[in-house]
């Protein structure tokens, strides 16, 4: 008899338990699942023509190449990449003078990546930020390694490259949004001979380095490309293989040659060093090699 009562109680318990589960399932109106994603900083993107933003599909240009057609290694740090650095040429028909004189630079040759068509535009620098680092700021600066010098060791000791113009572009933001966030060449020096400018200093001359492009707000440039074009009022539509297919002098960059340097009728050259500084440096997660 006791066994029958116990079995009956167990059966009742099971039936009640199942009934409770069915009732619970019938009354459940919603449930949750999860989703997740983790990012690491991106690889080097394409070089693009400096254009007013926001614009993600700008014209793609060739990488900076050496004389053998190989890509030139450019500074990078934690997903922040220098995309383009300029070579400055001031032409080969400059007349010497008894006075201090400024010689304008000639526009720089750039090439479309797909068609290899050339066009010429003012000198520029470009930095892409795919760091994914919300705290990152960065600065690109330049210094001239030594005075202009000829093969027979004649030097232009006090000759300096001067920058007279600046236009900033960014692929995520229009120019108005860049104010006080993107800075660069200060154009804060003047003399009686020319308009305001900034000079590229010579190393070892206690002149420091010249900042040419800087993001001053943490994370502002993440997922974008920023350019500084050394010309006031630069508009990208003015430069193309159809419109500017030959080099020409322009006023944004000039070489200031004092009479005291006594320039000779010969070719002078120099080298420039460009440095990228990133804070706080490498982001938390980086691609594995």
Regions from the PLM with identified roles:
Residues 7, 21-289:
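Signature of Gram-negative chaperone-usher
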Residues 1-8:
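Bacterial Sec-dependent N-terminal signal peptides
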Residues 11-17:
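Bacterial N-terminal signal peptides
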